[in-house]
UniProtKB/Swiss-Prot annotation:
Entry's Gene Ontology molecular function annotations: methionyl-tRNA formyltransferase activity
Protein name: Methionyl-tRNA formyltransferase
InterPro entries in the record: Fmt, Formyl_trans_C, Formyl_trans_C_sf, Formyl_transf_N, Formyl_transf_N_sf, Formyl_transferase-like_C_sf, GART_AS, Met-tRNA-FMT_C
Gene3D superfamilies: Formyl transferase, C-terminal domain (3.10.25.10), Formyl transferase, N-terminal domain (3.40.50.170)
Superkingdom to which the source organism belongs: Bacteria
Bilayer-spanning residue ranges: none
Catalytic function, reaction form: L-methionyl-tRNA(fMet) + (6R)-10-formyltetrahydrofolate = N-formyl-L-methionyl-tRNA(fMet) + (6S)-5,6,7,8-tetrahydrofolate + H(+)
Keywords, in A-Z order: Protein biosynthesis, Transferase
Job description of the protein: Attaches a formyl group to the free amino group of methionyl-tRNA(fMet). The formyl group appears to play a dual role in the initiator identity of N-formylmethionyl-tRNA by promoting its recognition by IF2 and preventing the misappropriation of this tRNA by the elongation apparatus.
Amino acid sequence: MRIVFAGTPDFAAQHLQQLLDESHQVVGVYTQPDRPAGRGKKPQPSAVKKLALEHQLPVYQPESLKSEEDQAALADLKPDVMVVVAYGLLLPQAVLDIPTKGCLNVHGSLLPRWRGAAPIQRAIWAGDLESGVCIMQMEAGLDTGPVLHEERCAISPDETSASLYHKLESLGPEALTKVLKDLDGYQSQAKPQSDANATYAKKLTKQEGKIDWTQPAAFIERCVRAFNPWPMSWCQSEHLKAGQNTVKIHAAELIQGASNKGPGTIINSTHEGIDVVTGDGILRITQAQMPGKKAQPASTLVNGYSNVFSPGLELQ
């Protein structure tokens, strides 16, 4: 079966590697154009491009797939199926129609829950107890196609987006190759999604990481895990230099207790953690990153930054 692969980040490269390991016939690889990265802002190839070139696979990097010329180039590859994993470009219907067996997408959620750009983060943010990957037959709509197969995994109480990402990174490739071995069979039993049960995982922004201390401690703690490694949950202190007053929270936990102090007020600082009042409950910060520094445990922070983390002071 002639496979065209489309993907960009490391998550996608893991799936391409699985196809190559199992000797599938990959006839072409699509990935986003090289983007400036690093301090020098030099154009850098994607993880998928690097892997494809290592295996002497033809690489295509169109800015979009809307032009007739780019669509003709894809058609010339005569694909039986196109596998799409975190590609980052929308595929017009004309592209979806080119492979004889259509286009398959590996999506990091249990569809129809968390269609969209940030399914891993939103699952933790919302307090979901499980996640997984779906192999979906692509349609013109955003993650709306029928589901051919799903694999589930539990979301642990201390799960971060980084750790859940790695779980799905191992589930996805196995699920994909399982489907490809009996594609006709899986397609014949594909299950339509229920639009009524759909939720949308909107893209994260840096501003969303700003902690609102009037929110419940349980919600803030989920945000700390959901937004790690990006955009990170963060707050500010008026006791740090203006313009360099952002504190990134890497880890936190819920503790029992209550206080009549206002949200954002620090009520206790020990080597175990920095206890902050929220709109409902107490949040203990156990690891944070000061401006220009690496992440540090609370035991280091309370000694080195008593001007920021002493009881009675506030975080904004």
